[in-house]
Amino acid sequence: MQYPHPGPAAGAVGVPLYAPTPLLQPAHPTPFYIEDILGRGPAAPTPAPTLPSPNSSFTSLVSPYRTPVYEPTPIHPAFSHHSAAALAAAYGPGGFGGPLYPFPRTVNDYTHALLRHDPLGKPLLWSPFLQRPLHKRKGGQVRFSNDQTIELEKKFETQKYLSPPERKRLAKMLQLSERQVKTWFQNRRAKWRRLKQENPQSNKKEELESLDSSCDQRQDLPSEQNKGASLDSSQCSPSPASQEDLESEISEDSDQEVDIEGDKSYFNAG
């Protein structure tokens, strides 16, 4: 089979079979291999003209542009070096060296800050806000439970002052420290005195009943506990003067209202 020799017009318009033809062809075509694009090797010399043969003209037109179809072909030879640098930066091994999605790494950093482990080894979320001492509120004050408050109020209605054995027994029953019971009674007496000053007539009967019940309870105690108590038989009289003596001798506590701070030994034990 004979192939006609392509003319100059056919060579200029001819389309290679393996790669698209550049829009602007240089005077001396340069093969676009990977080595040439990345600038790793010298440019291949222009093939020397040979005698016309049935396939020589077709081969001379196709061989300089025989390049893999997945490699991009530059539009203009003046941009070949710039495109080579861009390709090396985009498709090189160091082009994607950094993390594509830094958000999971940031979440992990925050997760370590939010997740902590308690002494038992269980993870807790937002532990700085959840791990708080029992009945502890802002300012270092203790918030008593409803049951504890009810029992303390019942005890205060019948007895305004507590002896050390009574304070110890009440603290053990309510699972509180003696210091907490002592301070609660101190604050409660301060509040009671303020109410008494505002309405002194309505509190006289309550004071007498409280004094009588306190004397009756102390007389029923064993002799050893009566020794530790600070009440005398002369103080168990319904007169107001004897009650003032009772308040001055039964306890060394002041009646100034103070904040109840948590007992560290009690909370650690609990």
UniProtKB/Swiss-Prot annotation:
It comes from Homo sapiens. Residues 137-196 bind DNA. Liver and promyelocytic leukemia cell line HL-60. Interacts with CD81; the interaction prevents nuclear translocation of HHEX. Interacts (via N-terminus) with SOX13; abolishes the SOX13-mediated inhibition of WNT-mediated transcriptional activity via competitive inhibition of the SOX13-TCF7 complex. Interacts with EIF4E; the interaction inhibits EIF4E-mediated mRNA nuclear export. InterPro entries: HD, HD_metazoa, Homeobox_CS, Homeobox_DNA-bind_prot, Homeodomain-like_sf. GO terms for cellular component: chromatin; cytoplasm; nuclear body; nucleus; protein-DNA complex. It comes from the Eukaryota. Residues 222-241 have a biased composition (Polar residues). This is Hematopoietically-expressed homeobox protein HHEX. Residues 194-270 are annotated as: Disordered. Recognizes the DNA sequence 5'-ATTAA-3'. Transcriptional repressor. Activator of WNT-mediated transcription in conjunction with CTNNB1. Establishes anterior identity at two levels; acts early to enhance canonical WNT-signaling by repressing expression of TLE4, and acts later to inhibit NODAL-signaling by directly targeting NODAL. Inhibits EIF4E-mediated mRNA nuclear export. May play a role in hematopoietic differentiation. The keyword Nucleotide-binding does not apply. One of its GO terms (biological process) is negative regulation of transcription by transcription factor localization. It holds the Pfam family Homeodomain. Transmembrane segments: none annotated. Residues 244-260 have a biased composition (Acidic residues). Residues 137-270 are annotated as: Required for WNT signaling induction. Residues 1-137 are annotated as: Interaction with SOX13. It is found in: Nucleus; Nucleus, Nuclear body; Cytoplasm.
